């Protein structure tokens, strides 16, 4: 498995504004809480980007990421009511 990487400033922003962090995402991945992985629906604007749907604290979050040759780069964490409803 490739290592995960992310922007430290973005992680701090997520902690302060959304009360979630990339560390929590990684923990959820290792706990097999990934519900889906799919290509980003807008490949023109976000070429090569994929999205994790991950359950954290009974809520589904969307985590866009880019799979590089040496790492998986996590872009952001988006809470999703629609995905939460879909997986309940």
Residues of each region from the PLM?
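Ribonuclease/tRNase effector modules and their secretory precursors
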Residues: 1-88
């Amino acid at each position: 498995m490739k290592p995960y990487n992310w922007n430290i400033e973005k992680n701090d922003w997520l902690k302060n504004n959304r009360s979630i962090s990339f560390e929590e995402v990684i923990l959820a991945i290792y706990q097999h809480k990934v519900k889906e992985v799919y290509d980003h629906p807008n490949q023109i604007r976000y070429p090569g980007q994929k999205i994790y749907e991950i359950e954290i604290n009974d809520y589904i979050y969307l985590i866009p990421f880019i799979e590089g040759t040496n790492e998986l780069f996590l872009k952001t964490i988006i809470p999703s009511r629609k995905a939460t409803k879909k997986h309940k």
